[in-house]
């Protein structure tokens, strides 16, 4: 549920997302933007509509409900629901909204078949497990699956999808290529029965760095939002030039001195070693600013990097503003992004947080949000 009770401000740059999409288009023939989980916190409807206007032929969401919400907003291109139709209500909604759900098993296939007709079959995407050990059919199911599909004219398979486990790690390229080989065998079996079925295997990392795994449709996700999935690896150059799309700022509640020898916040985990000035900002773990950032986080105040002091509280956090002249109550402090070279990236914040940029964006993006709609 979106957070609505605080004074945080999330600003999403649609222009940056479109720039990243264009960057991806230079290496991918048919990228299907992944906008699940509220577009990784960036706003499902706004991001989806901007990408459709830019020429995206389809987008991928997580649930059928997300897809229906996007369709209701006026999205006219194809929508693939990656988690599939989880129950009968989902199956009905997918059929009525023209959403393409993934199918994970025979029961799900039959659930969807009940919603279609021979004249108006429900389009589906077949989900295969090639190494994630998570969801879907296996390579050994292809023959029996095709036999069952031939008896169900009320469904039409239009795509087969699988997901790569370590495409972002070149030290495990053998596993990635093994997944690719398994998917190739799956596609051969499917196309002997359904010649027009499309294949989709590549995530952001594979889209950027492994063209041999592109197949017909590519599924960039985190790269759309400015995070390099290959950061810190020998393949990092393939993800350079992506633009961050989210910034998060909060107001200063109070500025006061912290004399040498005085502690601050719960647990007294920080004691000033010299006279300092602190600002208490309106952000805490209830605002999805993690308690793991206690004594580790950084923020941008007055154009400068400043450290978090002591423990992050439920709705407040202390920062050291000793070297930020003139800072006052009501000024904005950036938890993510921020003006000038001091900006904090999602990847950097994730490192401090002990997580990944995906979680940072999904969680902070739940705060009050607006979009910069200027797309050139």
Swiss-Prot record:
Enzyme class of the recorded protein, top EC level: isomerase
InterPro entries: Ala_racemase, Ala_racemase/Decarboxylase_C, Ala_racemase_C, Ala_racemase_N, Ala_racemase_pyridoxalP-BS, PLP-binding_barrel
Metabolic or biological pathway, per its Swiss-Prot or TrEMBL entry: Amino-acid biosynthesis; D-alanine biosynthesis; D-alanine from L-alanine: step 1/1
Cofactor(s) required for function per UniProt: pyridoxal 5'-phosphate
Keywords: Isomerase, Pyridoxal phosphate
Chain positions recorded as substrate binding sites: 134, 314
Superkingdom: Bacteria
Pfam family, any one: Ala_racemase_N
Positions where N6-(pyridoxal phosphate)lysine occurs in the chain: 36
Keyword Lipoprotein annotated: no
Record's catalysed reaction(s): L-alanine = D-alanine
GO molecular function, one term: pyridoxal phosphate binding
Gene Ontology CC: one annotated term: cytosol
GO terms classed as biological process: D-alanine biosynthetic process
EC number: 5.1.1.1
Catalytic residues identified in the record: 36, 266
Role description: Catalyzes the interconversion of L-alanine and D-alanine. May also act on other amino acids.
Family: Belongs to the alanine racemase family.
Name of protein: Alanine racemase
Species of the source: Nitratidesulfovibrio vulgaris (strain DP4)
Organism ancestry: Bacteria, Pseudomonadati, Thermodesulfobacteriota, Desulfovibrionia, Desulfovibrionales
Gene that this sequence comes from: alr
């Amino acid at each position: 549920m979106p957070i609505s009770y605080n004074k945080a401000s999330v600003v999403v740059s649609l222009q940056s997302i479109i720039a990243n999409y264009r960057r991806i288009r230079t290496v991918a023939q048919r990228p299907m933007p992944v906008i699940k989980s509220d577009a990784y916190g960036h706003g499902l409807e706004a991001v989806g509509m901007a990408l459709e206007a830019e020429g995206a032929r389809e987008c991928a969401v997580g649930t059928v409900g997300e897809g229906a919400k996007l369709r209701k907003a006026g999205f006219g291109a194809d929508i693939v629901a990656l988690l599939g139709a989880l129950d009968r209500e989902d199956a009905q909604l997918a059929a009525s909204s023209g959403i393409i759900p993934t199918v994970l098993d025979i029961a799900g296939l039959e659930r969807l078949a009940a919603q279609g007709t021979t004249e108006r079959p429900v389009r589906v995407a077949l989900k295969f497990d090639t190494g994630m050990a998570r969801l879907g059919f296996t390579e050994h199911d292809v023959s029996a699956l095709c036999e069952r599909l031939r008896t169900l004219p009320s469904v039409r398979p239009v795509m087969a999808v699988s997901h790569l486990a370590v495409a972002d790690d070149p030290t495990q390229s053998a596993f990635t290529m093994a997944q690719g080989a398994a998917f190739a065998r799956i596609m051969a079996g499917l196309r002997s029965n359904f010649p027009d079925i499309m294949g989709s295997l590549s995530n952001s990392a594979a889209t950027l760095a492994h063209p041999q795994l592109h197949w017909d449709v590519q599924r960039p996700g985190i790269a759309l939002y400015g995070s390099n999935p290959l950061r810190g690896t020998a393949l990092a150059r393939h993800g350079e030039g992506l633009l961050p799309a989210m910034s998060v700022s909060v107001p200063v509640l109070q500025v006061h001195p912290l004399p040498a020898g005085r502690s601050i916040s719960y647990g007294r985990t920080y004691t000033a070693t010299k006279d300092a000035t602190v600002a208490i900002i309106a952000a805490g773990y209830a605002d999805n600013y993690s308690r793991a950032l206690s004594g580790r986080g950084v923020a941008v105040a007055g154009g400068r990097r400043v450290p978090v002091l002591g423990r992050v509280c439920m709705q407040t956090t202390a920062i050291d503003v000793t070297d930020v002249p003139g800072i006052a109550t009501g000024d904005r402090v950036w938890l993510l992004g921020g003006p000038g070279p001091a900006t904090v990236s999602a990847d950097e914040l994730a490192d401090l947080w002990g997580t990944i940029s995906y979680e940072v964006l999904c969680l902070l993006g739940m705060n009050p949000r607006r979009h910069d709609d200027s797309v050139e």
